[in-house]
């Protein structure tokens, strides 16, 4: 047992010389491991008389405890030194400019909606909204679309039941506004609409913008002038515009509006017309006193024409390579 002090001294010296945690662990194994120098001292107890073994065992355990405490202290010192060294290497130069956060960008359809709202806002139009789950009265009946009209067919409309559907147009917003507000009325109604169609130029969900004016002495001339100014503003050029006679149940007379494309061909951009007298009567407005015009346009189609996009579905595929072009 006399050489225990020497083993402890040797272990302490080795501990102090360990330059890293790995070397320190080797010292631990050498002295305190299963076959370590101090651990093997316990096997010498069987050579002693039984009455001396407890005292001798206590001395060995005390020696092991001294070495373990030295190991713990040295490990703490080595870990602190390693941490300080790493912190010194990773010091942040606060004088350097920070990393620039990449700015997001508006979706091209959102850009179109904002641009149109801005234009009509300057003309005194206010933005009105309504529910996307609509009833057949506001989506069809009040708009002079009777039960036998093809637009009410299952293959064109997403029906929940006999009376509820996903709105096929934002015209229901016009009906609600005219019921709640007395003329003069001047609104635009942007929003999502739903139709059972999917191809290169159609998707089951798309964005529509409708406009409505109801007042005294509103004429088709007012309609033409408003839309002509809008199209020139939106496309930022003096366009050749054509109003082509058409049919919509809720307007009379009705027209589709075309602009001359760069390829020399007419391109349809929106539909419009004078509010049908039956629609005015349905909302309690006297068509003998008031008149109005309405127009509607697809936001995706206008965006395609403005930016030269050929496939409408690209707006909904979330391809960043496509969307980043519009930042």
UniProtKB/Swiss-Prot annotation:
It comes from the Bacteria. It comes from Enterobacter sp. (strain 638). CDD domains: PheRS_alpha_core. GO terms for cellular component: cytoplasm. GO terms for biological process: phenylalanyl-tRNA aminoacylation. Its cofactor is Mg(2+). Binds 2 magnesium ions per tetramer. Mg(2+) binds at residue 252. It catalyses: tRNA(Phe) + L-phenylalanine + ATP = L-phenylalanyl-tRNA(Phe) + AMP + diphosphate + H(+). Its EC number is 6.1.1.20. The gene is pheS. PROSITE patterns: AA_TRNA_LIGASE_II. This is Phenylalanine--tRNA ligase alpha subunit. HAMAP family: Phe_tRNA_synth_alpha1 (MF_00281). Tetramer of two alpha and two beta subunits.
């Amino acid at each position: 047992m006399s050489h225990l002090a020497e083993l402890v001294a040797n272990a302490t010296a080795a501990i102090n010389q360990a330059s890293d945690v790995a070397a320190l662990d080797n010292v631990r194994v050498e002295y305190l491991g299963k076959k370590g120098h101090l651990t093997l001292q316990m096997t010498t107890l069987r050579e002693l008389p039984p009455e001396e073994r407890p005292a001798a065992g206590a001395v060995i355990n005390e020696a092991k405890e001294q070495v373990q405490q030295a190991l713990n202290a040295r490990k703490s010192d080595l870990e602190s030194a390693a941490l300080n060294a790493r912190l010194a290497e990773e010091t942040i130069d606060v004088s350097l400019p920070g990393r620039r956060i990449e700015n997001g960008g508006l979706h091209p359809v959102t850009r179109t909606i904002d641009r149109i709202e801005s234009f009509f806002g300057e003309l005194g139009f206010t933005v009105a909204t309504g529910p996307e789950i609509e009833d057949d009265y506001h989506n069809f009946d009040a708009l002079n679309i009777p039960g036998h009209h093809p637009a009410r067919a299952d293959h064109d409309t997403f029906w929940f039941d006999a009376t509820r559907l996903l709105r096929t147009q934002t015209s229901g917003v016009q009906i609600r506004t005219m019921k709640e507000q007395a003329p003069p009325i001047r609104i635009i109604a942007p929003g999502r609409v739903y139709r059972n169609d999917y191809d290169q130029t159609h998707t089951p969900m798309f964005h529509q913008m409708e406009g409505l004016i109801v007042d005294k002495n509103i004429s088709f001339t007012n309609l033409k002038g408003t839309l002509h100014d809008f199209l020139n503003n939106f496309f930022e050029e003096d366009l050749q515009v054509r109003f082509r006679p058409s049919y919509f149940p809720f307007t009379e007379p009705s027209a589709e509006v075309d602009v001359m494309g760069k390829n020399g061909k007419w391109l349809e951009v929106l539909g419009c017309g004078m509010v049908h007298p039956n629609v005015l009567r349905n909302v309690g407005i006297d068509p003998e006193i008031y008149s109005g015009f309405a127009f509607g346009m697809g936001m995706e189609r206008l965006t395609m024409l403005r930016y030269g996009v050929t496939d409408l579905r690209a707006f909904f595929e979330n391809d960043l390579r496509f969307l980043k072009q519009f930042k």
